[in-house]
Amino acid sequence: MTSADKNNPDTSTAQGSSADLGVTVPKGFSAAAVTAGIKPSGKSDMALIRNDGPDDIAAAMFTRNQVTAAPVRYTKANNDGTFRAVVVNSGNANACNGAQGDKDARATAEKAAELLGCQPGDVAVCSTGLIGDVLPMDKVLSGVDELAGKLDQSITAGNDAARAIMTTDLVAKEAVYHGDGWSIGAMGKGVGMMAPSLATMLVFITTDAHLPSADMAHEALAGATPTTFDCIDIDGATSTNDTVLLMASGASGITPDAEEFNAAIHQVCLDIAMQLQADAEGVTKRVSITVGGAETDADAQTAARVIGRDNLFKCAMFGSDPNWGRVLAAVGMAPVKMNPEAISVSFNGHPVCINSTGAPGARTVDLSGADIAVEVDLGVGEGRATVWTTDLSYSYVEINSEYST
């Protein structure tokens, strides 16, 4: 794939293109994946991404759940605008393990730092998997040793890393953005326990752009997450481990202007977010809920979340049932101002409720397709927001009822 003019950027996804994808597309990054034996399945379960420089700029966003996993606490404490590498394990969240969890997260970083020739604080640590089980540190430390010896700048190495961080994901999530002589790569995981504060997920973004300061990286990431990852709300649950990490190597030697860079980071975050929604646990319907006519954008987002979390609404979507009454019943519980007599609803562009009353043909709207767009107007203002969710299927219940067994 060739680079594109900055006014016509080239963006590809793991689901939409056979082009090179992932965290090793940008210059100055190495990656590796191994099977350390953490997952009972025997699948790969550890990954390492190293920023080979010359820069080591970084920015990160974390879960807002008050119960945080040890790797989140460790990485957050060392988030000073620089990271040289990140170690990731899947199959174990290292969450709710007390002092032992903190010790294990720190030991993981120390082992990686020793092998990579940097300080422990230069290494971010991320974990994903079952909460409450202590990490098998003999396997983790052996895995770090093996990872360091396998680091490679090939595209395949990045693809392997994307697969190694998967838990109940069915497919790896990767993306790439080509600017004018510089690029962005990304990989992510997460299909369940997805709600605001990034949704349950780990996302790693790399760029070979030269950023003058960590402030530029933070501004781009902080500006992108509210309208991308924070808008995914699959099941109303927020993970203890959510982390989005951006690392910049500067290897291209090119500094894009801030507006261009911010837009590119947003585009990549949106790309990964849509892949997360598409692979959500048990998903058969991808549902976008747009609420307008609210007093503020924040109110609109709150109302959209209330609808998206309503189990009766989600069941209706699973059954392709254009039951607009469930939308009204759900949104009526939102703690925002609305005109209860002037709410309008449409499914896939077809009005099904006007002024809180059923519209002609409402019961016959076809929702059999995989994508459903729900639009709601609260009738009191100009606020508008969109939240992405899914249906509630038999498979979702099956997957989550058997998760720890």
Swiss-Prot record:
The record marks 128-129 as: Involved in the stabilization of negative charge on the oxyanion by the formation of the oxyanion hole. One of its GO terms (molecular function) is glutamate N-acetyltransferase activity. Residues 1-21 are annotated as: Disordered. It catalyses: N(2)-acetyl-L-ornithine + L-glutamate = N-acetyl-L-glutamate + L-ornithine; L-glutamate + acetyl-CoA = N-acetyl-L-glutamate + CoA + H(+). The keyword Disulfide bond does not apply. InterPro entries: Arg_biosynth_ArgJ, ArgJ-like_dom_sf, ArgJ_beta_C. Its main location: cytoplasm. The record marks 199-200 as: Cleavage. Keywords: Acyltransferase, Amino-acid biosynthesis, Arginine biosynthesis, Autocatalytic cleavage, Cytoplasm, Multifunctional enzyme, Transferase. Pathway: Amino-acid biosynthesis; L-arginine biosynthesis; L-ornithine and N-acetyl-L-glutamate from L-glutamate and N(2)-acetyl-L-ornithine (cyclic): step 1/1; Amino-acid biosynthesis; L-arginine biosynthesis; N(2)-acetyl-L-ornithine from L-glutamate: step 1/4. Substrate binds at residues 167, 189, 200, 281, 400, 405. One of its GO terms (cellular component) is cytoplasm. It is found in: Cytoplasm. Its EC number is 2.3.1.35, 2.3.1.1. Residues 1-18 have a biased composition (Polar residues). SUPFAM superfamilies: DmpA/ArgJ-like. The active site is at residue 200. GO terms for biological process: L-arginine biosynthetic process; ornithine biosynthetic process. Catalyzes two activities which are involved in the cyclic version of arginine biosynthesis: the synthesis of N-acetylglutamate from glutamate and acetyl-CoA as the acetyl donor, and of ornithine by transacetylation between N(2)-acetylornithine and glutamate. Belongs to the ArgJ family. HAMAP family: ArgJ. Heterotetramer of two alpha and two beta chains. This is Arginine biosynthesis bifunctional protein ArgJ. It comes from Corynebacterium jeikeium (strain K411). The lineage of its organism: Bacteria, Bacillati, Actinomycetota, Actinomycetes, Mycobacteriales.
